[in-house]
Swiss-Prot record:
One of its GO terms (biological process) is phenylalanyl-tRNA aminoacylation. Disulfide bonds: none annotated. It comes from Saccharomyces cerevisiae (strain ATCC 204508 / S288c) (Baker's yeast). Residues 2-173 are annotated as: Contains the major tRNA-Phe binding sites. It is found in: Cytoplasm. Its EC number is 6.1.1.20. This is Phenylalanine--tRNA ligase alpha subunit. It catalyses: tRNA(Phe) + L-phenylalanine + ATP = L-phenylalanyl-tRNA(Phe) + AMP + diphosphate + H(+). L-phenylalanine binds at T333, Q374, V375, E376, Y414, F440. The gene is FRS2. GO terms for cellular component: cytoplasm; phenylalanine-tRNA ligase complex. The modification N-acetylserine is found at S2. Keywords: Acetylation, Aminoacyl-tRNA synthetase, ATP-binding, Cytoplasm, Ligase, Magnesium, Metal-binding, Nucleotide-binding, Protein biosynthesis.
């Protein structure tokens, strides 16, 4: 038994109840107290409860206001001294922080007004007031907080406002209330932690006391590799696709020609998506060869320039050299285009999917990265319709735990009709977009040589969005990139997409 544990038992024997360990043992920190109490509780010597008290301390700025007065009082006194004050001169005379906050709060309190000359002057209610008798509420409340006096009487809104203004900082004091346990005494017998063969053979265990198992304690963390959350969710998606009869497409070609990334998908060469601000172009090498399929190339040229297969085209001069430029693929539909072109050699119903990285030259923020993962599914069959697409989307997302979908018409260059897919998000209490879908255009499919009655459904969604929702990640940079915490990777649980993903 430690000296501190013995001190606690003696004080408890003297008082019957220790109402505040903070007051009784001020020289010991809360962690030392908690450790000693837990040890004594394991011996049934005592019981204790934790009491947390919220505290507030003045920041450097708050202490300055306490000593010098609030910004609004400084402004009012300056206006009284000068008579009037040009608004443009407030910042230069008082500084940007004092001027901005002081003006706002003085107007709010009704202490100042703006005249016809765009000057600040004292309001009517302060015209004949001695400013020394004017109550500086901000300063008074800060003094009250510093003295820890009647904090319960301060309105919560006022405290929140002071915190937002960074005039006070919230803290916490941990205290404990201690009472006697069922086996209380000031003597402490050491508890055995292991049952040995000698104890059993000599029956010595009958006279010993053993430390009870603590089933609530954390085990030692095993040092081992761990799967990234994106890999876990990716594997869930793969299993959903496999269970629905899909085959995975090869997706390891990150660099594509503009032909497969844009032209084969019926995206015109003047489309904004092909601009430098949206697409990463490869510097070395700059270009690559085009497909050897001359009929296919002629069809693409014709369908862009004057139209074919029921289309009037885009009516522009299509340039083969534009197709040869190398880019980091902006979507995984480039993979689908290659696979569908191969399918044209032996047309038949098929189901394909891919999950891999794509790249966009766009601003990075909490929900967008220049590099992310796209989940894409492609289903080809004879004489299927938009109704089949809707039904299939409902079945696909139901396996992810997402039901009650809504579909909204949208525009994609390579699908028509096209639909955005929305689901109700219980946490956000609103409909959120979870995917994009459509039927690939005849201009794209028939150019490849696919028969007219073989139609293709396609849809895609981000891998990051469901992962962020599942793991409650607010900033995508904490999920992917150099800011990811290794502790987060090692401790996150497995993901099951069929368990209320969007709730």
């Amino acid at each position: 038994m430690s000296d501190f544990q013995l001190e606690i038992l003696k004080k408890l024997d003297e008082l019957d109840e220790i109402k505040s360990t903070l007051a009784t043992f001020p020289q010991h920190g809360s962690q030392d107290v908690l450790s000693a109490l837990n040890s004594l509780k394991a011996h049934n010597k005592l019981e204790f409860s934790k009491v947390d008290t919220v505290t507030y301390d003045l920041t450097k700025e708050g202490a300055q206001i306490l000593n010098e007065g609030s910004y609004e009082i400084k402004l009012v006194k300056l206006i009284q001294e000068l008579g009037q004050l040009q608004i443009k001169d407030v910042m230069s005379k008082l500084g940007p922080q004092v001027g901005k906050v002081g003006q706002a709060r003085a107007f709010k309190n009704g202490w100042i007004a703006k005249n016809a000359s765009n000057e600040l002057e004292l309001s009517a209610k302060l015209q004949n007031t001695d400013l020394n008798e004017l109550t500086d509420e901000t300063q008074s409340i800060l003094a009250q907080i510093k003295n820890n006096s009647h904090l319960d009487s301060i309105d919560a809104k006022i405290l929140n406002d002071l915190k937002k203004r960074k005039l006070i900082a919230q803290g916490k004091i941990t205290d404990f209330n201690v009472t006697k346990g069922p086996e209380f005494s000031t003597d402490l017998t050491k508890l055995e932690t292991d049952l040995t063969s000698d104890m059993v053979s000599t029956n010595a265990y009958k006279d010993l006391k053993f430390k009870p198992y603590n089933f609530n304690s954390q085990g030692v963390q095993i040092s081992s590799g761990a799967l990234h959350p994106l890999n876990k969710v990716r594997e869930e998606f793969r299993q959903i696709f496999f269970s629905m009869g899909f085959t995975e497409m090869p997706s390891n070609q990150y660099v594509e020609t503009g032909f497969w990334n844009f032209d084969a998908l019926y995206v015109p060469q003047q489309h904004p998506a092909r601009d430098l601000q949206d697409t990463f172009y490869i510097k070395d090498p700059l270009t690559a060869d085009l497909p050897d399929d001359k009929t296919y190339m002629d069809n693409i040229k014709a369908v862009h320039e004057q139209g074919r297969f029921g289309s009037i085209g885009y009516r522009y001069n299509w340039k083969p050299e534009e197709c040869q430029k190398l880019v980091l693929r902006t979507h995984s539909t480039a993979i689908s285009a290659r696979m569908l072109h191969d399918l044209a050699k032996d047309p038949k119903p098929t189901r394909l999917f891919s999950i891999d990285r794509v790249f966009r030259n766009e601003a990075v923020d909490a929900t967008h990265l220049a590099e992310f993962h796209q989940v894409e599914g492609v289903l080809a069959d004879y004489n299927i319709t938009l109704g089949d697409l809707i039904k299939f989307m409902e079945e696909f997302f139901e396996r992810m735990g997402v039901t009650g979908l809504r579909f909204k018409p949208t525009y994609n260059p390579y699908t028509e009709p096209s639909m955005e897919i929305f689901s109700w998000h219980e946490g956000l209490q609103k409909w959120v977009e979870i995917g994009n879908s459509g039927m690939f255009r005849p201009e794209m499919l028939e150019s490849m040589g696919l028969p007219k009655d073989l139609r293709v459904l396609g849809w895609g969604l981000s891998l990051e969005r469901p992962t962020m929702i599942k793991y409650k990640v607010q900033n995508i940079r904490e999920l992917l990139g150099h800011k990811v915490s290794l502790d987060f990777i090692e401790t996150n649980p497995a993901a099951r997409l069929d368990e209320d993903l969007y709730e």
